[in-house]
Amino acid sequence: MENSFAQSRPSNGCDKFEKMRKVAGVEPGELRSQLRASCAVVSPNLEGMPTQSAVSSLMVTISSNTNASVTCTISNVQANMICTPTYTDCTTVTTSICPTTPYDNGLPTPLSSLPNKPSKANCPFQAHDRTVNRKRKGVSQPPLPILTPSPSRKTKRQATMPLNEEASTSTAAALNNNRFALLSAEAENMEQDVSDADSDIEDSAARDGGGQSAKYSKPPAICVPSVSDPVTLERALNLSTGSSNYYIRISRFGVSRIYTANPDAFRTAVKELNKLNCQFWHHQLKEEKPYRVVLKGIHANVPSSQIEQAFSDHGYEVLNIYCPRKSDWKNIQVNEDDNEATKNFKTRQNLFYINLKQGPNVKESLKITRLGRYRVTVERATRRKELLQCQRCQIFGHSKNYCAQDPICGKCSGPHMTGFALCISDVCLCINCGGDHVSTDKSCPVRAEKAKKLKPRSRLPMTNNIATLKPPQRSSSGYIPAEALRTNISYADIARRNTTQSRARATVQAEVIPTSDNSLNNKFMTLDNSIRAINTRMDELFKLIHETVEANKAFRELVQVLITRIPK
């Protein structure tokens, strides 16, 4: 009997009975006692009798040679997950071991560990399908009819196994006397609740963007200049971000550019470089950049707190509000102090630049037409087209907010921040070109070269000039319209008429050309007179400047004489 049992029973039979026991949803001891009691009611002398265990796609039936039968109902889908085609094995039923009882009395594992159930570790980019295995809770479902799809139809569902007719007959007969039907219903409800909970958790994570399936932009490069020991840099990045989350490229200027795989690796690399006191610079992440809009149609003296509250009522978080100023020479305000007088000719404009926090619906803020009692217009702020220069290290291409290099003065190129209070030198020295001007001077040759590269290229489509060329049009002055078609005209009349028309055309051209020449001459004469008047005014201006310089020199000499004569 032992040999026949070893040959007829599959190697994974214990695992299958273990899974069927877990579907029942009860402890091993309770299930054993119930099965033992059911067997004892029908026949108390079942010990040592050979039994036959049949596993169908809908229920598990344990029957002996007598009339005693015990049936454990499971769902159709669970049977498809657990069972293979029906097999029969012979064993011995005793009062201590049941065929559906595992060899170990371990605690039941969660239902998420059953086969054919999606796992978060295996499928991190997919959520559970809520439409699968949806049943009414608390009601045991009857066997579903088998629907065979057509060969031409493409389906992703798993093919169901055909049911055995004999097993279906025995199942229908055993439904009336089944003592474990409630266990089957409770197991189905338990599995459905766990599946719904997992689906809700994954759906909420996907909506929040906190899972791995959330989309993110490509992080910018981290620029590290003057790297003398690249091995140490790689070792530090490997320990902090991981060797597979970054790569390095060297530019033609010798700057090491570190490209990371995701924003988390980017932030980790920046923190590590800051710990090492490394000099570097980078740009802001796209997810952290504010959404900048322009608010028009609102009074300039409206408090910023009121505007912030109005945007908060619409569901947007305001990060910063800025009201620009413009020059107003008509309304000059003079503020006189003890030793100096300053002129304030800038007034606030009736518009605000507002930085909003990034969000999924932040673009909907452009549809706002009313803030409080004001009828407003919200537009996307235009991007600044001028060349960006760092006010910390004076290098072009990044800002001081994301620069970790040593400060350099924009006036004397000293090792300090730009400021006349800290700068003791009177000589200007540009750090970029070495010229005698400040680093922010518009005439810097390095700045001019960088600005040329920023000019946008023409986006007009390339057209074929030969195909777009138009034929030359005749002047309207020499054009004579054709006459209506007439009959009974000889060839001599036509030739005579053509000769007359050519003579008339030559006469008209001779009369028109002198007129055009006279008009051009008059225009040139007017332009020449204007240029002469401008030259005269420029000469007068130069003389006035020269006299002013001479007077300034005389004034300085007079001051020096007065200083020398002052008694000490």
From Swiss-Prot:
Acidic residues biased stretches: 189-203
Zinc finger (unnamed) in chain: 390-403, 403-423, 430-444
Gene Ontology molecular function, alphabetical: zinc ion binding
Segments of this protein annotated with the region Disordered: 128-170, 189-218
Organism whose genome encodes this protein: Drosophila melanogaster
Protein name in UniProt: Nucleic-acid-binding protein from mobile element jockey
Keyword Repressor part of the UniProt annotation: no
Region (Three zinc-finger-like regions): 390-444
Tree of life domain: Eukaryota
